[in-house]
Amino acid sequence: MVRPTAFRMNEETAGNNYYQKVLDNVSPEDIVDQALEEFDNMVDILRSEGVNVIVFEDDPETDTPDSLFPNNWVSFHADGRVGLYPMLAENRRVERREDILFDLEHVHRFKISEVVDFTEFETHSVFLEGTGSIVL
């Protein structure tokens, strides 16, 4: 899980993500504080139920309001393959972090046998945002 330090309505994705809205009378700082509190509470609940939760801190140098949703840029598969997906929004692309994959493999002992990188499709304006996409 990625701890959100810049959480807010993402102006780059709000046009096609109808779950986002501007919250009147709530400061950006209050939104981040509430998101962090909810995140930390969820981590505590999951751990109290025996779930092994790995938390990565968001990169404070980047503007990544959706960083707590890594399931859109990466997927992990039982056979050790990792998928990296092409993202529509520029600030979502910045969420992809090699340090996370490195730590998962070398610190947390995840088996990574192959990284399947589809991100080249961004240059062709073709996007498939991991679990954010559904094929019917």
Q: Residues of each region from the PLM?
A:
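The feature marks the mature, well-folded catalytic cores of soluble enzymes
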Residues: 1-136
